[in-house]
Amino acid sequence: MSKGRIYEFDPILYPRLLWIVKGSGEFVREHFRKKGGEELTEDDVDMRYVDAWVCKCERKSDNRLGIVFFFDTGLEAKQLVHECYHALTAFVSEINADLPDYDSDGMEEFAAYLIEWIFDCCWKVKQGKVK
């Protein structure tokens, strides 16, 4: 069994968890599979060419659904924000919603709050402020 750590966050209002994973791709594959039951492949979690990875997954231990956010702790803030957007779109697609336009009379606020929450979770893990 490979070494790693899973940080779990529950957005409460949304029916999916956010798992931020530190460790190897092998560690991710030991604990998660793709949503729908398909196993993650080595290519899915290959970090040689990317600094972060986001995927809709199931936790193998209990089949809970969520978003896995796997990143190198050396990730810069601008890259982290980029990946947070991918996590946001994964959450939004899981509730069968669309991202609203800016000119939608404030209807985009839910997405702004959700991406803020995702970034805050990631930033706390990156800064070592989560136990």
Task: List each language-model region with its residue ranges.
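Intrinsically disordered, low-complexity regions enriched in Ser/Pro/Gly/Gln/His and often acidic
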Residues: 10-12, 46, 110, 116
